[in-house]
Amino acid sequence: EEKIAHALYSKGIFPEAVEYFDKTLAHLGRKQPSNNITVMIRTVFGFLALIKLLYFPATRKFQIPNKLDVRVSNIMHPKANALAMIDPRKFFFESIGVIKDIYRFNFTLYQDLFDFISGCSVLFSYTGISFKLSKRILDYTKDRSTSGEKLVSLAYHKVIEKSHNLLSGSRDSGLEESVVDELLSIGDSFSASTYLWCNFIQFNQEGSFTYAKKCLGHLKSISDKFHDDFSTMIHFIM
């Protein structure tokens, strides 16, 4: 079921992917709560854990995640991306709730943990709750990206940063094709397409139509190569 979930996700078939991700998590003993009261309690504790992580990092020692924790993070990251597209409300509450479970780990040691924490920035920029908190998450994770035993990639981090800048009205350096290339090299067409989408919108707003057209060309190439519904949909919309 886990392989099916990842296959569906890579093809942009998000509703079915989430269904199989949930089944896998249930088999691993990490079933997400459905009771509204439990969800709200997890949300509150998850938010408090995030604040503690961002503003009081010196008061705690990180733990090393075990194999199950790493496997769960490998599931939660793509699941969160899929939920953001099909159910923003569930995406917000589930992602905040999961922070409580993973904030105690040294997220700089594992790419998926690092990407998940970085991606939490979207919870506050996408919803418009707090661009300040969204930026704080980006700065915090970037500052610690070289503090682990091995370097983590900032490619996905730059996708989230691009989204934050677009939503907050901040200017940035524009399209970095190396980000697209790196994401595609690991088969992450979702993040590559999202990055190009945000750049396309920015270039259109600035009147830089030549660069906007370049983004379209990249998206067409991704759609033709990966045949996933998400990049095809984004290309069609643009």
Give residue spans per PLM region:
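Extended non-membrane alpha-helical scaffolds
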Residues: P78-M238
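Amphipathic helix-loop-helix modules that constitute alpha-helical solenoid scaffolds
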Residues: A7-F93, Y126, G207, G217, ...
